[in-house]
UniProtKB/Swiss-Prot annotation:
CDD domains: AdoMet_MTases (cd02440). Residues 409-419 have a biased composition (Polar residues). The gene is rlmG. This is Ribosomal RNA large subunit methyltransferase G. Its EC number is 2.1.1.174. Residues 386-419 are annotated as: Disordered. It comes from the Bacteria. It catalyses: guanosine(1835) in 23S rRNA + S-adenosyl-L-methionine = N(2)-methylguanosine(1835) in 23S rRNA + S-adenosyl-L-homocysteine + H(+).
Amino acid sequence: MTTQFSVAGIELELARYPKDQESNLQAWDAADEHLIKHLIETEQTPVVTAIINDNFGALTACLRSIAPTWPLMVETDAKTSLLGNLQNLATNNLSSEGIEWLNSREALPEQIELVLMKLPKNLTYFAHQLNRLSQVLPKGTQVLISAKAKSINKSVLELIGKNLGSASASLTWKKTRVITCISDGEIRSLPKEMQWSVPRLNLEIRNLSNVFAANKLDIGAEIMLENMPKGDFKSIIDLGCGNGILGLHAKQLFPQAYIHFVDDSEMAIESAKQNWALNKLDTQGLVGEQATFGWDDCLTHMSEGVRPDLVLCNPPFHQGEAITDHIAWQMFLQSWRALKNGGILHVVGNRHLAYHIKLQRIFKNCTTVASNGKFVILQAQKISKKAEPFETHPTEAEAKVEVTESKPHPQSSLYGTKK
């Protein structure tokens, strides 16, 4: 992994979060470099600056290296982004003192004088962010947005103009461009949250703007819902929960269970929380809080007192724009550590991702529950708590092994297939 950042005289050591990822991925891209280069060339002085979508803190660290007391507020929806920012400030002995950390729903301060943004892939979320800015930015405030040149087109510039103010793009540098937007001072209302029904499950689902599958079930969740495990589960984690539909349906199937929703996206956690309340799933007479909601990097900060007997998992294989399998590795390993002995990890994924190899290495067993041409559902059972599982990536030969249908693990018949 390249960790030496160097642009316009700024030298930093930057790493992705968590650090133990594939060596070919780095914590910044040319769009970060272009934005910093632009600030240096225009001799930008330290003013109250909002930084939005700074994946691992490259922009934050650069500004604090230019001026250690540069007044900053940093907004992110991803917990790994927040942790990456803090990690890289500490690595470079830069102070985080005075930085205001915000999630993507918290009210923005009104004293912002400059905004630096990375263009997100999700343009619905981007429009939401622009609307939020329109509610606090005075007329004439400069907003700089960097992205790959191929991601910037007439439609994007029109979207910015509609939701914040007139925009124009720079010349291309390293296949990136910087958009300059000048706030027009007009206040826009936030877009309404998406809400849709799943009649066969008797569920209403609400999605905030940065949550995957905005207005329908994604295909992976669909096949998972058709092949939920069977058993007497009392503690269930919906890991990478998104809008929470797997955990919601698990509560319908296992009303005596306590459900723990966990996701890297704060908007996902808020969506799951709203959907729990919307569908009124608390079981009468069951003592205590029946659902918890954790904005977390997988299970890194989950209480050790939570010992699930079932983890439901639909792992992402993207982190930002990077394709990576480290999230799946982390989810599987942390699930193994968290599960009770005999507990089950129930996973859905694309067939080509070869999750069966990872599960076999960690759990020493793996069963194919169901599959179609694109997706496969796998189940692994924790049958030993004595030794840490093997944690390295598969060899090239292992990665070519095909998923095969197999019988359930002899200690588990806890799944059912669609009738």
